[in-house]
């Protein structure tokens, strides 16, 4: 795969108002305090990590995010593709409309590309695509953007990922018994009891050239669907192992060169078992350092492929440990982890429905930009 640069990036999350603040909070081990929603089926509260209320609409947040990523004077964008990656898209708008009008009507339906097309028209992007592949949406956005750049179809690609609070996600994941009743987000803990959903908005500008101060290089990656089950992936880890191997092959590296694995780590039963087995199939006993980020961001669903990627590359000098390392299914660290700035990184994103993706990344330093 042709290496592609993440020239700039922006993040708004429960962990911080911007990427710098989120990285500082992560390195300081500061977890955001979750709010809650009522799980109707059980009439019980469940935690939720929301972005601080700024009074902005989703459109205003996305515009601000694009401004942070493109700069104050972005110029013409007729050489730039927009890829919008999200699970929720505009479902929260639809939910409010249904509530206001007393039920759903056929005319309430909107096209899948409504948000992306609105941004394309207002900002002047060359084209706009929408990716909706569950928790791999943004990771797939990075991969598709990289392929289009390598093919010379566009000069730049702006990947925008957003995940807003919605009843269908909250109630749906809750009904599947996937949300944590204890509010303890513990990926790979033997007594883990589910995930904490999170809100996030993230963006990055991709290009073949590094630009002035690039964040990272996307060296390779792979995405595929495990069709053995309608909702999950094979718990023996075989499909995850294959996806990671193909990602490494596309980058021209082997498992022994990986300096850190960013695990998907949802803290759900089946997903953590599958990932744990897959990681052990790939690395055997020679596991590199491992980290999880969802306890600090929440599971940002369609946005996690970008929100976690940006946070990862900004925090390599101090990634927090977990307080249950001795019990974990994989050898997580109890102490903060520091890896070399130019380490090769493997980042995993495994989606509901069996769509699995892995990225091979390297943070840009003065020497390797």
List each model region and its residues.
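Conserved "HGTGT" condensation-loop signature of ketosynthase/thiolase-family condensing enzymes
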Residues: 1-128, 147-150, 172-196, 202-204, ...
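Short beta-strand-to-loop elements that line the ligand-binding cleft
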Residues: 130-132
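Short conserved active-site loop signatures built around small residues
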Residues: 138
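Active-site alpha-helical elements of protease catalytic centers
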Residues: 141-142, 205
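Glycine-rich phosphate/pyrophosphate-binding loop and the adjoining helix
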Residues: 153
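Glycine-rich anion/phosphate-binding loop at the beta-strand->alpha-helix junction
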Residues: 156, 161-166
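Short gly/pro/ser/thr-enriched loop/turn and capping motifs at secondary-structure boundaries
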Residues: 165-167, 297-298
């Amino acid at each position: 795969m042709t290496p592609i640069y993440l020239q700039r990036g922006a993040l708004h999350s429960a962990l911080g108002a911007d990427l710098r603040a989120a990285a500082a909070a992560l390195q300081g081990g500061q977890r955001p305090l979750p709010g809650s929603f009522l799980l109707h089926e059980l009439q019980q509260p469940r935690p939720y990590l929301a972005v601080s209320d700024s009074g902005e609409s989703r459109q205003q947040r996305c515009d601000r995010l694009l401004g942070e990523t493109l700069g104050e004077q972005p110029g013409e964008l007729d050489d730039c593709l927009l890829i919008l990656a999200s699970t929720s898209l505009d479902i929260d708008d639809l939910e409010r409309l249904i509530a206001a009008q007393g039920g759903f009507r056929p005319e309430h339906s909107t096209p899948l590309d409504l948000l992306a097309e609105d941004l394309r028209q207002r900002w002047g992007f060359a084209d706009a695509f929408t990716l909706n592949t569950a928790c791999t949406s943004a990771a797939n956005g990075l991969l598709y953007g990289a392929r289009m750049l390598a093919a010379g179809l566009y000069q730049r690609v702006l990947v925008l990922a957003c995940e807003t609070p919605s009843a269908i996600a909250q109630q749906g994941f809750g009904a599947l018994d996937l949300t944590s009743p204890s509010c303890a987000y513990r990926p790979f803990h033997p007594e883990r009891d589910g995930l904490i959903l999170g809100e996030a908005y993230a963006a990055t500008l991709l290009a073949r050239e590094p630009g002035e101060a690039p964040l990272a290089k996307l060296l390779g990656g792979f995405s595929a669907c495990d069709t053995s089950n309608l909702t999950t992936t094979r718990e023996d880890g075989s499909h995850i192992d294959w996806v990671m191997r193909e990602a490494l092959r596309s980058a021209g590296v082997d498992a022994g060169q990986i300096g850190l694995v960013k695990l998907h780590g949802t803290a759900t039963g089946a997903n953590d078992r599958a990932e744990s087995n897959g990681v052990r199939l790939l690395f055997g006993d020679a596991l590199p350092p491992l980290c999880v980020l969802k306890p600090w961001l929440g599971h940002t669903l369609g946005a996690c492929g970008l929100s976690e990627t940006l946070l990862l590359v900004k925090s390599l000098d101090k990634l927090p440990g977990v307080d249950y390392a001795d019990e974990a299914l994989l050898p997580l660290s109890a102490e903060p982890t520091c890896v070399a700035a130019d380490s090769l990184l493997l980042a995993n994103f495994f989606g509901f429905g069996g769509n699995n993706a892995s990225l091979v990344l390297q943070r840009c330093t003065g020497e390797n930009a």
